[in-house]
C-alpha cells in the first residue's frame, strides 16, 4: 500500500534492525495529539484540575494495545485491515464500511486542519481563512515527501511529534504544576460528577482514533528481509516509544491547563483561542507562543496522517486510487466551507470528535477477529489474554462513547 523498505539483516544485530524499523508508530501516534486532544484536555484540566489525569493514562495504555494489534496484522498477513474486511465481508457491507471510513477520515481531517489554521491565526495574527491557506500549503509540502518513500515522511512527522513533546515540557516548566497532586491524579481513579464522566468519555474518544487503526496496518504490511518475528519485536519497541511520547503530551496538556487555569480561578476555559489569550497574562508571551507553535505542529502533522489514512481506506476497501494532491484538495473543502460560513471553530472540533466515536468499534471489532485467527496470523496470533484485553477495550470505548453521544443528544 505504502512504500516499504528493504534492510539487509545478514550482518546486523537485532538492536540495529529495531532502530531501522522504527517509524510507523510515530506516524500513528501523531493522531493521538491532534487539535481535538488539545480542546478536550484543556477543558478537562481547566474544569477538574488533575482529577482526570488517570483517564489519560489508561486511554493511552488502551491505545498502545490497539495500535500494536493493527501493526501486527500488517506484519503477519501482508495486508491491511481495510483489505481484510474487503476480502472477507459481503460486498454491500464492504461499501458501507468504506463510506463510513471516508466520513471518519474527513471528520478527523476537518478538526486537524482547522486546528492548525487556529494556530496560525493565534501566532501570526492572520484571519482564520488565511491560516487555512497556510495550512493547505504546508501540508502539500509535507505530503510531497511521500514521493521520496515512507522514511522521509516518518522522520518529518516523528520530528514534529518530538517538537510538540518538547513544547509541552516547556509549558510544564512555565506552569509549575503540583507534582504530588499530579501524581495522585494519574494513579487514583475519580469521577466526581456527571460532567467529569462526560469529559472522561471525551478524552477517550479523542484518544483512540479509528483512521489510524486502518493506517498502521498499512504502514507495516510491507518489509524487507527481516522475519516476521523480528519485525514484530521492532514494532513493539516502536509502539512503546511513540505512544509513550504521545501519552506524555496528553498528560502535559491537561496538567498545564490544570496548573495555569483551574488553580488560578479560570475553570470555564472551553476554547483553544480562549486558552491562548488567557495564557499570556498568566504565564507570559513565551508560554503562549510555545502553545501556538505546538498547535500548528500537531495540526499540520495530524492532517497529513489523515490524508494518508484516506488513501489507505479507499485503496483497501474499493481498490480505487486518486493522486494524493487530489485527495488533499477534496478533504480541505469542508474546512474552507466551515470557515467561510463563520461557524465556531472549537465547536466544530468537538463535534468532529463525537462523529469519530461511531467508527471506533467498527474498526476494533474486525481487527480483533482477524488478529485472533490462527490460520490468518500464524505464530503471531493473539493470546487468549490479548483477546480478552482487546474485547475489554472495545466494551469500554463503546460504552463511554455511547454515554458521550447520549449526553449530547
Curated annotation (Swiss-Prot):
The cellular component terms of Gene Ontology attached to this UniProt record, alphabetical and capped at eight, are:
plasma membrane
InterPro entries to which the protein is assigned, alphabetical: NRAMP_fam
Q: Does the keyword Methyltransferase apply?
A: no
What keywords tag this UniProt record? Cell inner membrane, Cell membrane, Ion transport, Membrane, Symport, Transmembrane, Transmembrane helix, Transport
Topology relative to the membrane, per the entry? Answer: Multi-pass membrane protein
Q: Where in the cell is it found?
A: Cell inner membrane
What sections of the protein cross the membrane? 19-39, 46-66, 98-118, 122-142, 155-175, 196-216, 241-261, 290-310, 320-340, 348-368, 388-408
Main location, first listed in the record: membrane
Q: Name one GO biological process term.
A: manganese ion transport
Keyword Chaperone in annotation = no
The protein's GO terms of the molecular function aspect are:
cadmium ion transmembrane transporter activity; manganese ion transmembrane transporter activity; metal ion binding; symporter activity
Q: Which domain of life is it from?
A: Bacteria
Q: What job does this protein perform?
A: H(+)-stimulated, divalent metal cation uptake system.
Name the family.
Belongs to the NRAMP family.
State the name under which the record lists this protein.
Divalent metal cation transporter MntH
Q: Which organism encodes this protein?
A: Yersinia pestis
